[in-house]
């Protein structure tokens, strides 16, 4: 059950992230080199991979929790060490940018925690 919850958390995170990137590519085009349809198209591979990971979490093979956890950790590390110090700062972020970043990263941490509980065999108690 934790895997399904993690999958839904990732669905929300990916939808928020994709909507944000579309907004940046259209309404903020030219603000930085990262605010363009070209940058958006280059990042679509990540969203396709995310969709495949989410689908595997919903389908439920035994390895899906491990793959989902690895995916979350990689995305978190990228966010902390590349996206925030490079991309965000070049974008001249406003309140929407920071809120999206905090919500997105928070959701990744929630999904990673749920998946870690799953791979360790832990359960949440009511």
Task: Describe the predicted segments one by one.
Residues 1-18, 107-110, 114-126:
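Cytosolic juxtamembrane helix and N-cap/initiation of the first transmembrane helix
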Residues 15-28, 54:
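Membrane-embedded alpha-helical segments in integral membrane proteins
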Residues 16, 36-58, 70-77:
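Core segments of alpha-helical transmembrane spans in multipass integral membrane proteins
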Residues 44, 93-110:
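Individual transmembrane alpha-helices with interfacial aromatic-anchor signatures
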Residues 61-64:
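Membrane-helix interface segments
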Residues 80-100, 120-123:
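Membrane-helix boundary connector in multi-pass membrane proteins
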């Amino acid at each position: 059950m934790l895997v399904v919850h993690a999958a839904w958390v990732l669905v929300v995170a990916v939808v928020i992230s994709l909507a944000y990137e579309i907004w940046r590519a259209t309404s903020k085009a030219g603000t930085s080199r990262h605010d363009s349809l070209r940058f958006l198209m280059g990042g679509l591979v990540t969203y396709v991979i995310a969709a495949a990971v989410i689908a595997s979490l919903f389908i439920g093979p035994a390895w899906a929790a491990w793959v989902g956890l690895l995916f979350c950790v990689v995305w978190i590390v990228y966010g902390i060490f590349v996206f925030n110090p490079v991309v965000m700062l070049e974008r001249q972020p406003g309140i929407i940018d920071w809120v999206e970043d905090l919500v997105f990263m928070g959701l990744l941490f929630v999904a990673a925690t749920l998946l870690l509980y799953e791979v360790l065999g832990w359960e949440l108690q009511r």
